[in-house]
Amino acid sequence: MASVPTHQSEKEKKNDELSTAILKDKVKPNRLIVDQSEQDDNSVIAVSQAKMDELGLFRGDAVILKGKKRKESVAIIVSDESCPNEKVRMNRVVRNNLRIRLGDVVSITPAPNLSYGTRIHVLPIDDTIEGLTGNLFDVFLKPYFLEAYRPLHKGDIFTVQAAMRTVEFKVVETEPAPACIVSPDTMIHYEGDPIKREEEEESMNDIGYDDLGGVRKQLAQIKEMVELPLRHPQLFKAIGIKPPRGILLFGPPGTGKTLIARAVANETGSFFFLINGPEVMSKMSGESESNLRKAFEECEKNQPAILFIDEIDAIAPKREKTNGEVERRIVSQLLTLMDGVKGRSNLVVIAATNRPNSIDGALRRFGRFDREIDIGIPDAVGRLEILRIHTKNMKLADDVDLEQIANECHGFVGADLASLCSEAALQQIREKMELIDLEDDQIDAEVLNSLAVTMENFRFAQGKSSPSALREAVVETPNTTWSDIGGLQNVKRELQELVQYPVEHPEKYLKFGMQPSRGVLFYGPPGCGKTLLAKAIANECQANFISIKGPELLTMWFGESEANVRDVFDKARAAAPCVLFFDELDSIAKARGGGAGGDGGGASDRVINQVLTEMDGMNAKKNVFIIGATNRPDIIDPAVLRPGRLDQLIYIPLPDEASRHQILKASLRKTPLSKDLDLTFLAKNTVGFSGADLTEICQRACKLAIRESIEKEIRIEKERQDRQARGEELMEDDAVDPVPEITRAHFEEAMKFARRSVTDNDIRKYEMFAQTLQQSRGFGNNFKFPGEQRGSDAPSAPVPAQDDDDLYN
């Protein structure tokens, strides 16, 4: 039987690989890794002789180079014996033209039809010719092109060094287009205004797939849906289906929906038409529909095209819920336009929204927006990819650990990480502000070179940034550890088995073919550390932690309380692995049917129904754990406590003596204490005190010490002033601390105010509940399978620990 889950996991693994198969680079002999060139020539690339033979090329052949974002260039190929077989050497100018960096992959194809040019038009970049006198042609262009036969591609930039200057030129036009070889007979035009550097940099910074991080699976889906039909429509024709028409991207704000659409347009070289939802609306009758029609007509003319509708929920809300006639007409118009897109036309409509459920249902059927792709909150790996993208042009100090930052930024989306990087950089500039004078025309080069963003700057930025998508329910990773909690060893073990094992050892559950338990309920007197335990386990396995206070889910509006529950569970799934902590569970999970009269039409009944269905629907693949805490286990609906939901019921009792000692030590770990203060004696004399009561004693002792310290300082200052008034000589002020530490006297005084928050009567109630639970569990104490006696080598059942701190009683 154990082989079944393994087989299943292999199948799932294969499906995962297939889902991202489109992203894998195909291994071809002409795809080579880019390396730094040893000779700085803009027109020459070098490969090994063996690679030239394999590709059927000869020294001096012209080749076409294909880089990223559909950029192409041309060059002359030569052999270099020191070049490894899988690499190609090229200089920085060629790399920039292809939008690639060292280590990227470039493809090389022969260009036998590349002819000599009749004319070319080149223009200089403005900031490289400032203050230049003399003829550009005679000084720069003529010697450069006479030196060798140079191939050029439209859009290329090349640099020419002469007269102690380096000038950059851009190829505006070539005849024949798009590339040619410049020979002595080629006419060179260089008239016209120089090209502005800003415009050139804008085109250099076109967004491509490289600028997208944390959306690997979604990108694979989009490439299947968009690139395949645009580049190879015959694929769909051969298999006999129509290519998809529309894609709906949805997800929280800032995850990169618009960015993905722009990247796809740039990488496919398609015409890109952007419609912002609200801009379509017009007060003139019929004009809104006309705007939509024009957009579709424009795209039909410029195929292949991508029409991107941002914020589609603004123009296509549910018709039955809108009062405005205009919105209904726009939705109808959009439906007919989507249906009117010709079957084989190279037009794909992409729409984006944060609220997919508010869009008209007719738009979401097959044949319109066929695919809905969730652009969710990135995980740690995705966050690291995004951070690397945003910091690739930043100057980072050696101590910056991007991996650590990525692990700590739970719930951050791409926009939040971009903001984090810019805040860290600004903090670095603030630190250097004393060296910068705003009145100066230029900043000293030494100051500019000393700028480097440090880990300390990132730490500061992390303190100021919070995840935008989860601001309503802050997802945090707590910093509480097991050492902060005194005693409760068995409870800790049980929690580790519940939360840590499924996260850290998922293969064990696969091996035995069983789903891990998903929920636990802590019950016990108030102030015994139920919340603290939940935080510690979330921190221990690096899970997110969403704390939900029961009463905040209930609202006066019909149906909204249930929607709040749904949202909370959706957020937990997005931020998995996640511990969902329901504090005061009894406020939302009371036994149903009791309060029909006065709770707003049974709002709490509906909320508990929603919680139950969400618990049953917890996706097995998502590591979401539910921990509930309550002081009133007797009034909780029994359906919540059945196995499969909150099946582990753990009693958190009042701390025993050893635990009280631990709690006192944890509370006072940062406090200076006098040597004669005996915490063991204090723990012995606080029987029946909860953790919160003990913490209050410590706080009161600290308060008394602070009061005494301030009073003594005031008295010393008064005596000093009196002596000064009498004209006496003042002694040297040694600034002695009047109260250096907390003493026994402070604790003796604090104990006069100490009180027990849990009465004996309360404890009896909890113990009775625990006893009833224990009796209902003992059903199978004497159960044994029939058959032969067990041999000595048979595995024996684990003997339950007979601790006084038993979990369940």
Swiss-Prot record:
The first ATP-binding region has low ATPase activity. The second ATP-binding region is responsible for ATPase activity. ATP binding to the first ATP-binding region induces intrinsic activity of the second ATP-binding region. While ATP binding to the first ATP-binding region appears to prevent ATP hydrolysis by the second ATP-binding region, ADP-binding to first region promotes the coordinate and cooperative ATPase cycle of the second ATP-binding region. The lineage of its organism: Eukaryota, Metazoa, Ecdysozoa, Nematoda, Chromadorea. Its EC number is 3.6.4.6. It comes from Caenorhabditis elegans. Homohexamer; oligomerization is ATP-independent. Forms a ring-shaped particle of 18.3 nm diameter, that displays 6-fold radial symmetry. Interacts with cdc-48.2 and thus may form heterohexamers. Forms a complex composed of cdc-48.1, him-6 and crp-1; within the complex, interacts with helicase him-6 and GTPase crp-1. Forms a complex composed of deubiquitinating enzyme atx-3, adapter ubxn-5 and cdc-48.1; within the complex, interacts (via N-terminus) with ubxn-5 and with atx-3. Belongs to the AAA ATPase family. CDC48 subfamily. InterPro entries: AAA+_ATPase, AAA_ATPase_CDC48, AAA_ATPase_domain, AAA_lid_3, Asp_de-COase-like_dom_sf, ATPase_AAA_core, ATPase_AAA_CS, Cdc48_dom2. Disruption phenotype: RNAi-mediated knockdown causes partial embryonic lethality. Impairs response to ER stress. Abnormal accumulation of myosin chaperone unc-45 in body wall muscles. RNAi-mediated knockdown in an unc-45 (m94) mutant background, restores motility. Simultaneous RNAi-mediated knockdown of cdc-48.2 in embryos causes embryonic lethality. Defects in oocyte meiosis I progression. Defects in embryo S phase DNA replication causing delays in cell cycle progression. At the end of mitosis, impairs chromatin decondensation and nuclear envelope re-assembly. Residues 803-809 are annotated as: Interaction with ufd-2. ATP 2 binds at G527, C528, G529, K530, T531, L532. It catalyses: ATP + H2O = ADP + phosphate + H(+). ATP 1 binds at P253, G254, T255, G256, K257, T258, L259, N354, H390. One of its GO terms (biological process) is embryo development ending in birth or egg hatching. Induction: Induced upon ER stress. Repressed by starvation and oxidative stress. Changing E584Q: Severe loss of ATP hydrolysis without affecting ATP binding. Does not affect rotation between the 2 ATP-binding regions in the hexamer in presence of ATP or ADP. Complete loss of catalytic activity. CDD domains: RecA-like_CDC48_r1-like, RecA-like_CDC48_r2-like. This is Transitional endoplasmic reticulum ATPase homolog 1. It is found in: Cytoplasm, Perinuclear region; Cytoplasm. SMART domains: AAA, CDC48_2, CDC48_N.
